[in-house]
């Protein structure tokens, strides 16, 4: 019987020092929210990878330390447009949502699409209609916007006015500003889980990139770029500069390296993240769970928040090879 695994990320990008504590707190809370659904205390092994992934992503969608749900980045019109995808590896079912507004949990809308509808991908008005018809609350316009997101949009606009390309000048954003929540390259949240039955599920959710045009669609809802799950190979959730991830098809390339080159989850993630940045210039990262339960965590961005639980210990990090660990409990 496979050992349950839950690996999550809170986005890759130019994350300032002042935001690290919030990222770590959010990662730990998301793991606490989800782990009990994946590995029940009764030891029955009957936990659900699908429930755990949704719960972990929902937790981060509620947390303004992440670019998903509440606190998502803003487009050029100052609005939040959300995207999410969810995929399960047994039957390759998936639900993909884009251009969703004024709904807190796009990952749940993606699950409802996957489980109850005949389509795989909905956007705009159709996604909005599905969300409201299946129980999502319609929030007041602007309810998902935070002061941090407004400040980051202003910083983006200032860089554009100075003739800079803010989508690639990631280290230009300063560390001494108190809030800016996300750099223009775009952070994302994601989770990959495998339960005791061997079922692999991946979920990814984002607000996109600061300063995007209204109607822009990124990598997160695109299968093979932002999300992919296949019980025969593994599961991948990616994060970073969306246009780069789409062009490179990062998630699928990582799984292909595992399948056809015999690489481990870690080696495949390292190889493809490096090759993507070398060829295209944009940065990003990925978390990977192989079909045997091995883990991969890799990024070419300055930082990427991540965490997982193993043998009663939580492991987490945000930069380089630095790994923090502490005893894991479900209570705060």
Curated annotation (Swiss-Prot):
GO terms under cellular component: cytoplasm
Catalytic activity: L-asparagine + H2O = L-aspartate + NH4(+); Cleavage of a beta-linked Asp residue from the N-terminus of a polypeptide
Disulfide bridge partners, by residue number: none
Entry comment on modification after translation: Cleaved into an alpha and beta chain by autocatalysis; this activates the enzyme. The N-terminal residue of the beta subunit is responsible for the nucleophile hydrolase activity.
Active site as annotated: 188
Binding residue positions for substrate: 216-219, 239-242
Keywords from the UniProt entry: Autocatalytic cleavage, Hydrolase, Protease
Keyword Protease: yes
UniProt-listed Pfam families: Asparaginase_2
Any one Gene Ontology molecular-function term assigned to this protein's record: beta-aspartyl-peptidase activity
The keyword Hydrolase belongs to this UniProt entry's keyword annotation: yes
GO biological process: asparagine catabolic process via L-aspartate; proteolysis
Enzyme Commission numbers on file: 3.4.19.5, 3.5.1.1
Family membership noted in the UniProt record: Belongs to the Ntn-hydrolase family.
Main function: Has both L-asparaginase and beta-aspartyl peptidase activity. Does not have aspartylglucosaminidase activity and is inactive toward GlcNAc-L-Asn. Likewise, has no activity toward glutamine.
Subunit field text: Heterodimer of an alpha and beta chain produced by autocleavage.
Name this polypeptide is given: Probable isoaspartyl peptidase/L-asparaginase CG7860
